[in-house]
Amino acid sequence: MPDAIRQLTLANGLQLTLRHAPRLKRSAAALRVHAGSHDAPAKWPGLAHFLEHLFFLGTPRFPLEDGLMRYVQALGGQVNASTRERATDFFFEVPPNALGGGLERLCQMLAEPDLGIERQRREREVIHAEFIAWSRNPTAQQQFALLQSVSARHPLGAFHAGNRYTLALHDAAFQQALAGFHQRFYQGGQICLSLCGPQPLDELERLARQQAELFAAGERVPQILPPPLPAMASALTFTHQSLPSGAEHALELLIAYLEDSRPGTWLGALRERGWLRRFTAERLYAFAGQLLWHLDLKLSADACPDEASALLQGWFRFIRQADREQLNHQFGLLQHSRAHSASALELARRDSTGQPFAKLDTQGLQALGALLESLPGADHGDWQLLPVDPLLKADLPHAKAQPLPAALKISDQLPPARQFAALYLRWHVPSPMRQPLQRVLEQALAPLQERCDRASVQLQYSSAGEYWQLHCAGLPAAVLRAVEQALALMLKPPASCWLPCTALPPALIPIRALLKQLPDAVRGSLPPAVPACTLTQQQLDSLWLHTEWHGMAAGFEDTALKALGAALEQCPGQGSRPSPLPTWANHRWQHAQVPGSEHALLLFCPLPAAKEAAGRLLAQLLQGPVYQRLRVDLQLGYAVFSAFRQVEGVGGLLFGVQSPHTDQAQVLDHLLNLLRHGVTLDPAARQALAGQFDEPAMANADVAEWAWQTHLATQADRLDVLRRSILTTRQTDLDHLLSALLDPGSAWLCLANAAAPDTSWQGENR
């Protein structure tokens, strides 16, 4: 049944979109203010971004400890904001019964912010830390250089992020501009608010009316039109001028077809030639009929860039001549799949921007025509308009039912009625050839992963220590088809995948690079030395003969399980059971070589499986103090977090910090001081945490991941048991757990981009 949608305008001018989606477990709000960095005075670069930060520092009515961020985080929700060129977005997702509290805090902080000078001073340092990280990030600098190349007259080429020197806090003119920007743009006529959740439309409307009346009445302020966008010299960057309304949605359709890498498409042609290494398409700017978008294409060393560009122009011409109704029909099927798989937060954000998951309307089709006409074209290449991807089919694949392997556990924690299935397969690969052969499998699975991404199916192939893992999740029919194809590719990779691949993955900021290495670090195994050799299918066949596997499925109904049995007939390796969890003694420090110059550290403190409930509550109670002390008081940097995490089946406290000026040893001291300070049990926080582990309140993917991690830990996967354990956790339980964690002999893992600070840590370089 399609979602029920209601749109209306409130008395203060605020535009409201409400979406009732009964399948959702959570509710979300997304608020867009039609003003961004290009609308701020050019004299004060970063003013709009700075104001966005200040909103989150609390107000007299809702101080920081009870503000939107803490409120949402305490409920296990998501919250964030983003300042773009001509708009600023605020959004959060929470359990349905908490939507009103979140919306009240959001509207109050935006309508009546506290812009005190002392908090401005502190937050300016956070902005400056972001600026330093941005200036050191190669990817960010490449994009900035691209924007600067557009036009010297267009504001796209200017600096808008802000730093310590552009935000002149003690200049009266700056303070006047800051207050004036808020008064001019943060009023009803400038705001679009969307609410989305399982609640009836009338309830959503009541909540919206009750809180949105905080905004002053106003009319839409005409935003200054930018100068023209000149044509770009780059073959992969495109500018458009004077496009009709609906052009952003039309570009989404075009990119959806560009991302199709099956034979007969542009990416398919590049892949057939062995040239394609990596591809992403990104809309960089859209406003007042202007569009700027870019194709980030990485080709092999032997590729011909001119031929790749010529093929692209040939494909543009083909799409321009294709039946647009047929294009739109297939796009509609893709959008329907995306909408069904989207979270409440994704749906609300799309609604707030006027870009719901839907096919093009009449205006959008006209915009598509104008967009295609403004693209270069050539009579070059052999192209096809392909049929609908089978991954979008809702019916189960036809196959003779087969019994499920004994190595596959069936979890009952995710009801089939959710229409979300997850499958985890894990292989123990002791062979020294696992690392080079892993790269072969990564290349083999890449085209299928691209198709899965388009069809809103998760397909992830990963490794940790001596283990390979395949994870697939989404609509049950799509999961079955994707897994069957994935296993076939893992058994017999195409010939092109055996060639050496020299493409490097995109560089990550230090803290994200450490998070990527964390599973390997927990496993504690270094990759074996492998002599250079030519890889062959025979080596892979031999590897599979000496490999053991086990897995877990969740969310499949009986008929789908029978089809899953057929799909797993070709699962390589011998069935087994989960391996013992990794363990280590005392404090272990791992020095990771990652790109970037900022100090970064992850501290992982494992806990016994029986202490999961107390550990989760302890992590919840530490989250606020960690953020307050490290991010707000000490201003170590903008990347600060703490949480309970399960990694390779091992549950524990995880702390992460990236700082441009405070080294790892100092960060560690601050964390230890926080732990020594202890926590005080808050019954309300305990109740809220327990509520997060009620299946109807958990995201489907989170239920499946929790069940899998619990399976790896060889524990019983019962959410009701975890909830009861949380509710019965006492202050003494938390005190004893903290005392055990602080014992010098406790098993800690510190993963950092620096050497151990002293000999109390057992060091290791990677």
UniProtKB/Swiss-Prot annotation:
Please give the pathway this protein is involved in.
Answer: Cofactor biosynthesis; pyrroloquinoline quinone biosynthesis
Q: Which cofactor does it need?
A: Zn(2+)
Task: Summarize where Zn(2+) binds, as residue positions.
Answer: 49, 53, 130
Q: What is its EC number?
A: 3.4.24.-
Q: Which Pfam family, an example, fits this chain?
A: PqqF_C_3
Active-site residues annotated for this sequence? 52 (proton acceptor)
Report the enzyme's class at the first EC level: hydrolase
* UniProt remark on cofactor binding: Binds 1 zinc ion per subunit.
What are the UniProt keywords, alphabetically? Hydrolase, Metal-binding, Metalloprotease, PQQ biosynthesis, Protease, Zinc
Concerning InterPro entries, the annotation shows: Metalloenz_LuxS/M16 (IPR011249), Pept_M16_N (IPR011765), Pept_M16_Zn_BS (IPR001431), Peptidase_M16 (IPR050626), PQQ_synth_PqqF (IPR011844), PqqF-like_C_4 (IPR054734), PqqF_C_3 (IPR054733)
The terms under GO molecular function for this entry are: metalloendopeptidase activity; zinc ion binding
Q: Which GO terms describe its biological process?
A: proteolysis; pyrroloquinoline quinone biosynthetic process
Q: Which family does it belong to?
A: Belongs to the peptidase M16 family.
Question: What does the UniProt function comment say about this protein?
Answer: Required for coenzyme pyrroloquinoline quinone (PQQ) biosynthesis. It is thought that this protein is a protease that cleaves peptides bond in a small peptide (gene pqqA), providing the glutamate and tyrosine residues which are necessary for the synthesis of PQQ.
This chain belongs to the protein called Coenzyme PQQ synthesis protein F
What is the source species? Pseudomonas putida (strain ATCC 47054 / DSM 6125 / CFBP 8728 / NCIMB 11950 / KT2440)
Provide the taxonomic classification. Answer: Bacteria, Pseudomonadati, Pseudomonadota, Gammaproteobacteria, Pseudomonadales
Question: Which gene specifies this protein's sequence?
Answer: pqqF
